[in-house]
């Protein structure tokens, strides 16, 4: 089976481990995009600590789960989103207002939709977490 998206596989592994009640999950291979996505999730308290393990190949990440995550997913293809259109995407992807985050990749880095609105930057939509 070929991998279509490393980020989608990583978020799928996190979702499955969270549903089965595991305390930690191993993600491999790793990438910079996965690490930045996990940093946004950690900043909002959806996951605990995570550790990058360099195995001189593609690397591994061990993520500590805290049971707060309901769902996280990837949006494929990565649609271009204007600042004015972010509100429409949050309404479509998230279950309620003020609940969860849409994660964007912008010229200023990977961030959630609220931070992108504050910094007044737009970009491509990566995924969501709630």
From Swiss-Prot:
InterPro entries: Ribosomal_uS8, Ribosomal_uS8_CS, Ribosomal_uS8_sf. The gene is RPS22. SUPFAM superfamilies: Ribosomal protein S8 (SSF56047). This is Small ribosomal subunit protein uS8. One of its GO terms (cellular component) is ribosome. The lineage of its organism: Eukaryota, Fungi, Dikarya, Ascomycota, Saccharomycotina. Keywords: Ribonucleoprotein, Ribosomal protein. GO terms for molecular function: structural constituent of ribosome. Belongs to the universal ribosomal protein uS8 family. HAMAP family: Ribosomal_uS8_A. GO terms for biological process: translation. PANTHER family: 40S RIBOSOMAL PROTEIN S15A (PTHR11758).
């Amino acid at each position: 089976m070929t991998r279509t998206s490393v980020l989608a596989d990583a978020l799928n592994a996190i979702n499955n481990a969270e549903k089965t009640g595991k305390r930690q999950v191993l993600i491999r291979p790793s990438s910079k995009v996965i690490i930045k996505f996990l940093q946004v999730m950690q900043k909002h308290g959806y996951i605990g600590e995570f550790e990058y393990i360099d195995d001189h190949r593609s690397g591994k990440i061990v993520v500590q789960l805290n049971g707060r995550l309901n769902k996280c997913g990837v949006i494929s293809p990565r649609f271009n989103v204007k600042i004015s259109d972010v509100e429409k995407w949050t309404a479509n992807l998230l279950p309620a207002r003020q609940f969860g985050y849409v994660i964007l990749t912008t010229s200023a880095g990977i961030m959630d939709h609220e931070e992108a609105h504050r910094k007044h930057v737009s970009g491509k939509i990566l995924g969501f977490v709630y």
